[in-house]
């Protein structure tokens, strides 16, 4: 997968290209991340990349000319078929379904805003989609872009060590993940659930699904409203709810 990034702070993306899962993906040639800095497309000695907004008001906007030239360079490098995304609080909120959709693209160009944002005409002429990571304001689009890259890269074949890992993540099936345990078997008097030590994979899978359903019901009940649960899942959820009521009543 190829991802181009337009950012005034390209060095921030070393966190993606040199570390962790995405860093290994870059090293093995599964993920290619290239950055363009609008400052490289300025022609004054101060490398100015901000400008005042028409109509006045606080703050500055990213200067149009350097930003557009950087986007054009990224498009030229990408060739045909690259989707251009602007990270913006006004965009579609990123969720697991959105990540899956974005992962079907072989090429993405992510535009990271700074200051008060970018000229609306640049959005109209250069941007295909706007995406947000949540209803809050950040200093720029770099962190949202890194979140998007990390989430999307997990669906690139070969990036994760186990092919099923991405499918079993929280939200992959619309549910929160089940609890996980590793050694020691007993920690501060708390034992690993016996079913996980049984070796019976059918029982283990049933327990995990019950915990996933129950955890979603407890923490994010609105997620269940949009799911068509199977008969088995309904039974498991009812079991969890009954067990939870018994524990809280003790």
UniProtKB/Swiss-Prot annotation:
Pfam families: tRNA_m1G_MT (PF01746). It catalyses: guanosine(37) in tRNA + S-adenosyl-L-methionine = N(1)-methylguanosine(37) in tRNA + S-adenosyl-L-homocysteine + H(+). It is an enzyme of class 2 (transferase). Disulfide bonds: none annotated. S-adenosyl-L-methionine binds at residues 113, 133-138. Its EC number is 2.1.1.228. Signal peptide: none annotated. Keywords: Cytoplasm, Methyltransferase, S-adenosyl-L-methionine, Transferase, tRNA processing. It is found in: Cytoplasm. Belongs to the RNA methyltransferase TrmD family. Homodimer. PANTHER family: TRNA (GUANINE-N(1)-)-METHYLTRANSFERASE (PTHR46417:SF1). This is tRNA (guanine-N(1)-)-methyltransferase. It comes from Proteus mirabilis (strain HI4320). The gene is trmD.
């Amino acid at each position: 997968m190829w991802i181009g990034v337009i950012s005034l702070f390209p060095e921030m993306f070393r966190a993606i290209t040199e570390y962790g899962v995405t860093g290994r993906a870059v090293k093995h040639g599964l993920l290619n991340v290239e950055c363009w800095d609008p400052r490289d497309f300025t022609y004054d000695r101060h490398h100015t990349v901000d400008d005042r907004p028409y109509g006045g008001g606080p703050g500055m906007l990213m200067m149009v000319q350097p930003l557009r030239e950087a986007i054009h360079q990224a498009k030229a490098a990408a060739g045909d078929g690259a989707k251009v995304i602007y990270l913006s609080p006004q965009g579609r909120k990123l969720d697991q379904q959105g990540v899956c959709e974005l992962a079907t693209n072989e090429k993405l160009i992510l535009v990271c805003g700074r200051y008060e944002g970018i000229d609306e005409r640049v959005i109209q002429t250069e941007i295909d989609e706007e995406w947000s990571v949540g209803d809050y304001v950040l200093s720029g689009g770099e962190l949202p872009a890194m979140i998007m890259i990390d989430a999307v890269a997990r669906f690139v074949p070969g990036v994760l060590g186990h092919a099923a890992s991405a499918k079993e993540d929280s939200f992959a099936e619309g549910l929160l993940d089940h609890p996980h345990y590793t050694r020691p078997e007993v920690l501060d008097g708390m034992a690993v659930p016996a079913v996980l030590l049984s070796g019976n994979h059918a029982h283990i899978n049933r327990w995990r699904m019950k915990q996933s359903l129950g955890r979603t019901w407890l923490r994010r009940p609105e997620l269940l409203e949009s799911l068509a649960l199977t008969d088995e899942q309904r039974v498991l959820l009812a079991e969890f709810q009954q067990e939870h009521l018994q524990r809280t009543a003790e």
